[in-house]
């Protein structure tokens, strides 16, 4: 009799992906650390996250607990997170982090623009007028002159701060 190409009943039909115990522990630790970051967030921010009811309640409980109870609760959060897809949660957390870093970058750009207005005067003010046509050219010139006088007299940089506030308001108005 000819033997057909049949698999023996003990041979699996699909390929099994083998994962080491160390890799599994590393993944679990990563989920627990993600849970810790969620516990550190304010409740108003947490409401915006795509969390299951169990996970949301576990996080709220962990925020109340202290010391050893909190450590155990964090382990429980890690366990609950194994049954949840962590990618949407991680994406929302990254979005919040990037929002803060992006705001910091914008403020640094405004500070550099303010420094240019004080140092270069009319040339930098013209650039500001191109970016923000609703800006008050006369007020910016006046503040730039005052800032230079304050700098020469070693006085506090009140006018520079005011220029920064004007630029910030113009930026927020966009």
Swiss-Prot record:
Tell me where the transmembrane regions lie: none
Q: Where in the cell is it found?
A: Cytoplasm
State the UniProt keywords alphabetically.
Cytoplasm, Ribosome biogenesis, RNA-binding, rRNA-binding
The record's annotation in InterPro entries points to: DarP, DarP_sf
Give an example GO cellular component term for this record. cytosol
Query: Which CDD domains is this protein grouped with?
Result: YjgA-like
Q: Which HAMAP family match?
A: DarP (MF_00765)
Record-linked NCBIfam families? PRK05255.1-1
Protein name per the record: Dual-action ribosomal maturation protein DarP
Q: What organism is the protein native to? A: Vibrio atlanticus (strain LGP32) (Vibrio splendidus (strain Mel32))
